[in-house]
Amino acid sequence: MSDTIAAIATAPGQGGIAIVRVSGDMAEDILRRIFRPVGGKHPLPTHLLTYGYIVEDTERIDECMAVIMRAPKSYTRENVVEFQLHGGGCVAQKVLAMCLSSGARLAQPGEFTRRAFLNGRIDLSQAEAVMDLIAAQGEQSRKAAMRQLTGGASSFIRKAADELYAIQAGVAACIDYPEEISEEEAASDLAPRIAHLAKTLTDACDERAARLLQSGLRVALCGQPNVGKSSLLNALLGEEKAIVTAIPGTTRDLVEGTLMLSGSVIHLTDTAGLHDTDDPVERIGVDRARRALADADVVLLVLDMSRPLSAEDESLLRTLHGRNGCIVLNKSDLPPVLTDSDLQDAADGKPILTVSASVPDSLQPLKSYLASQAAVSDQLTLTQPRHIAAARRAVAALHQAEETLRSYSVDLAGVDLQQAQMALAEITGDEVEEKLLDEVFGRFCVGK
């Protein structure tokens, strides 16, 4: 990391401000070469914005603000310089080119954050939280990413690792001093502690909640043609996303939209009406609808309450059995023919909500239901699929160690415990291969 890196840190396109970031030993030299402070001189004070101009030879390139953050009090723990320029690609590209011609090289994706990790300012789980914070679409995801960035996952894993070290010390004592600690005594003392640690880690592994934070809740609207699925989708989204006509089978392909409820991201998919058809195009739409239902976290079965329950509706109700979802009685603004009492037996305990796509206030119970399905605990510890996978490997090794220990093979149990320790260290990056670092930081943008 002896070289100096530079990159544009803001998104491409026009905007109020564009930022060029430089990190490394030559950062301050580059600042001196291309920035002329107004009413001041170099060296600039650390961590304070200074007004001036980017200058090439005698030409003023841009009017800007510049700041130097001297090591170790910077994002990378190296000398870091940032130029706050007028937004727009041309200016930022020009200033970046000047930085590169002055001795810096173009940063790789995620290299600034990678240097923060390698220099010990953050661990690997916190580095991943930076990406999660950037990618967060909802308040719920933002809060989870911030908890991880401020060390929530790290402190939990390190506490678990400390307990594991203590258990390993007990195993080592039994091996080194067999005349003082028998294998039976070691098993009696350590096996319950291993089991408790395995349970603690298992409780922290909630794959569904982690996926909701990463990707949002997937909701599929299904039902027969002309029950108002597309109208309901449009009403929930507050826009005319799907084409609505009185002609059955208007929706032939999947229509998707994203809704934000109580800080959660909810992806809605309107599907083609589920029915038998000889139309080859419509049949493709029905097949896609069935695949969307299979992939959904929540299924909304939409029924038209202005007409009686049909055999096809009853068939759809049966397909909802064993699935997470609810029954939506639509068109409540029309004279009712079908009521929730008619569906109690067929509902299989699913919630039954009465709405009208044309009456916005009637949608609130449905929105509340969707928000509850998308909610995750504020106490969720592990939110990254990679972390959960590593914790699962640690749990498997702990269970193996417990079983081995109870058969009085203390030395073999020590091997299993070491495997568990390595899995936990992979989460924080204490033990990690270069290939994994490339994979993690390769997901970042260049300027981060």
Positions of the model-derived regions?
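Switch I (G2) and immediately adjacent beta-strands of P-loop GTPase domains
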Residues: 50-62, 66-70, 249-277, 295-298
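Inter-motif core of Ras-like GTPase G domains
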Residues: 282-306
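Generic enzyme active-site microenvironment
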Residues: 268, 302, 328
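C-terminal-of-GTPase-core extension/linker across diverse P-loop GTPases
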Residues: 2-8, 12, 52, 139-260, ...
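Conserved beta-strand segments of alpha/beta enzyme cores
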Residues: 105, 265-267, 351
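Short beta->alpha junction loops/turns
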Residues: 23-24, 88, 248, 305-306, ...
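Short glycine-/small-residue-rich Rossmann-like dinucleotide-binding loops
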Residues: 237, 272-273, 297, 304-305, ...
